[in-house]
Design a protein with these regions (language model features):
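Acetyl-CoA-dependent GNAT
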Residues: 2-101, 110-112, 116, 151, ...
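Short glycine/proline-enriched coil/turn segments at helix->beta-strand junctions
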Residues: 115-123
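Generic C-terminal helix-cap and adjacent flexible tail
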Residues: 163-169
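Active-site phosphate/pyrophosphate-handling residues
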Residues: 108, 136
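Conserved beta-strand-loop-alpha-helix junction that forms the acyl-donor binding cleft
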Residues: 101, 124-135, 151-156, 161-162
Length: 169
């Protein structure tokens, strides 16, 4: 059974080190492709270094929601959702421990983040271009790659957008 807890309730069960460790495992499984430059590898490592601070900051920010998933009491993943402006809503971080890939942890976190952002509002996310599994997952939740959007990242990313009321497969 998946248990979802948000903000302070989640932080009562996990530490900053737990967030960092889970992010390290999640990125190791999904962020790396064979041809990354040293700068790209370092950019991916930075994600791990800033994960706990970012999550703790989200818990203290009324425009963000940190939601953690637990399976049988074990920390399995998290999502950070951010409202930048009324129609600028971002599914900011979605990290799932590789041990729980293929379970509904990612789906439960995705639904929680999207519901908090408002299914009747447009939303977006960014995804590493070579992470085809994640792209397919986001497409199942109504997101489509915006090929006109440009994002300046060391590791190439796509912006994916979801129109209000888009169907979930």
């Amino acid at each position: 059974m998946i248990e979802l807890l948000s903000d302070r309730a989640a932080l009562e069960r996990i530490s900053a080190d737990d967030i960092t460790s889970l992010t390290d495992r999640a990125t190791a499984a999904t962020f790396y492709a064979g041809a990354l430059t040293p700068e790209q590898v370092e950019a991916n490592r930075k994600v791990v270094r800033i994960a706990a601070e970012t999550a703790l900051g989200a818990c203290a920010n009324e425009h963000q929601l940190f939601t953690a998933a637990f399976v049988d009491g074990r920390f399995a993943g998290y999502v950070i959702s951010t409202v930048h402006a009324a129609d600028d809503r971002e599914l900011d971080w979605l990290m799932v421990d590789p041990e729980f890939h293929g379970s509904d942890v990612s789906g439960a976190l995705m639904r929680a983040g999207m519901e908090w952002l408002g299914l009747d509002r447009p939303m977006w996310l960014n995804v590493i271009q070579h992470n085809e599994r994640a792209i397919r997952f986001y497409q199942k939740h109504g997101f489509e790659v915006d090929h006109d959007a440009v994002i300046e990242k060391i590791v190439p990313h796509f912006i994916m957008r979801r129109a209000p009321g888009s169907e979930v497969l």
